[in-house]
Regions:
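N-terminal capping segments
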Residues: 1-57, 170-181, 205-207
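Aromatic- and glycine-rich peptidoglycan recognition patches
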Residues: 5, 102-207
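Alpha-helical scaffolds flanking conserved acidic
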Residues: 8-11, 86-87, 120
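Generic signature of intrinsically disordered, low-complexity, basic-rich segments
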Residues: 11, 51, 58, 65-67, ...
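Catalytic cysteine-centered active-site loop
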Residues: 24-88, 94, 98-99
Length: 207
């Protein structure tokens, strides 16, 4: 039985159902980007927005990740990573160390807090490959990510801190789901009428 629409549990449920999704056939081509009108662009934010729509959860537009984080801050529903108590359904924002981009550049949905300074996050446009691009990897993956400097355990190794903070959507009352209209089939090109052959004129008779 599906979790209640508009709830954190439903948001997580919807997101986890997409695990294993791979972009294509073109680079950054996804149903998530088609939904937000940002197809063929990095799509981690579009994935989150698509999931929120399916779960009927109200949250700021986070297709552009820095703007999404700023909106949560402005709404007073933002927690800095080191001070946070993340919960399932929270929106995790990332700034990966040493990736050449010194700002928030990735986003995902918290599945659970591991209790060791790390969380499990379901993310779009990432990869399980250690050497792969974590913020443009082309897949939907469940990842273990650190949000506190002191993290890990005897069983699980520590990880570099990538999460800078969490935003909490307005769970509770479901918002109306936006339906995605299928693109109309392309109309066949009109056939050109064959060119008319000019009528032959007979040479004037000699008198």
């Amino acid at each position: 039985m599906a979790a209640v629409q508009g709830s954190a549990a439903r948001l997580v449920e919807v997101a986890l159902a997409e695990e294993g999704y791979v972009e294509g056939p073109k680079d950054n081509e996804t149903k998530f980007g088609a939904f937000t009108g940002s197809n063929f662009q990095p799509w981690c934010g579009s994935f989150v927005m698509w999931c929120a729509n399916e779960a009927q959860v109200k949250m700021p537009n986070t297709v552009y990740t820095p703007a999404g984080a700023q909106a949560f801050m402005k709404a007073g529903t933002w927690q800095k990573a080191e001070e946070a108590t993340p919960q399932p359904g929270d929106i995790a924002y990332f700034d990966f160390p040493n990736d050449g981009v010194d700002r928030i550049s990735h986003v995902g949905i918290v599945v659970k807090d591991n209790g060791d300074g790390t969380v499990m996050v379901i993310e779009g446009n990432t990869t399980k490959a250690k050497a792969g691009d974590q913020r443009n990897g082309g897949e939907v993956c469940l990842q273990r990510r650190a949000y506190k400097k002191k993290n890990g355990s005897k069983v699980m190794p520590s990880k570099p801190v990538a999460i800078v903070g969490f935003g909490r959507p307005a769970f509770g009352t479901p918002v109306k789901k936006k339906e995605v209209k299928a693109a109309a089939p392309a109309k066949p090109a009109a056939k050109k009428a064959p060119a008319k052959t000019p009528a032959k004129t007979s040479a004037p008779k000699k008198k």
